[in-house]
């Protein structure tokens, strides 16, 4: 698989990146090099290799899933123009 100049311009347009005509050949080469690397990865034999999420054997540190107000509700609503019982008061939008 290879990327042509039209595809480079289309990708740049979709990414909202301004690319000059002088930059297109360089970007085309870069994208083709990335795709070649990905193609090399697909050729690697991974039969019998266990899936892993990290190269280091460590357990995820988990915390208890508790509902908490953060103990800063007064600071949070202090900046509000109007509040009541730790809730923001906003003007009515729909009549």
From Swiss-Prot:
NCBIfam families: gatC. Pfam families: GatC. The keyword DNA damage does not apply. GO terms for biological process: glutaminyl-tRNAGln biosynthesis via transamidation; regulation of translational fidelity; translation. One of its GO terms (molecular function) is asparaginyl-tRNA synthase (glutamine-hydrolyzing) activity. Keywords: ATP-binding, Ligase, Nucleotide-binding, Protein biosynthesis. Allows the formation of correctly charged Asn-tRNA(Asn) or Gln-tRNA(Gln) through the transamidation of misacylated Asp-tRNA(Asn) or Glu-tRNA(Gln) in organisms which lack either or both of asparaginyl-tRNA or glutaminyl-tRNA synthetases. The reaction takes place in the presence of glutamine and ATP through an activated phospho-Asp-tRNA(Asn) or phospho-Glu-tRNA(Gln). It comes from Rhodopseudomonas palustris (strain BisA53). Belongs to the GatC family. InterPro entries: Asp/Glu-ADT_sf_sub_c, GatC. Heterotrimer of A, B and C subunits. Its EC number is 6.3.5.-. SUPFAM superfamilies: Glu-tRNAGln amidotransferase C subunit. The gene is gatC. It catalyses: L-glutamyl-tRNA(Gln) + L-glutamine + ATP + H2O = L-glutaminyl-tRNA(Gln) + L-glutamate + ADP + phosphate + H(+); L-aspartyl-tRNA(Asn) + L-glutamine + ATP + H2O = L-asparaginyl-tRNA(Asn) + L-glutamate + ADP + phosphate + 2 H(+). This is Aspartyl/glutamyl-tRNA(Asn/Gln) amidotransferase subunit C. Gene3D superfamilies: Glu-tRNAGln amidotransferase C subunit, N-terminal domain. It comes from the Bacteria.
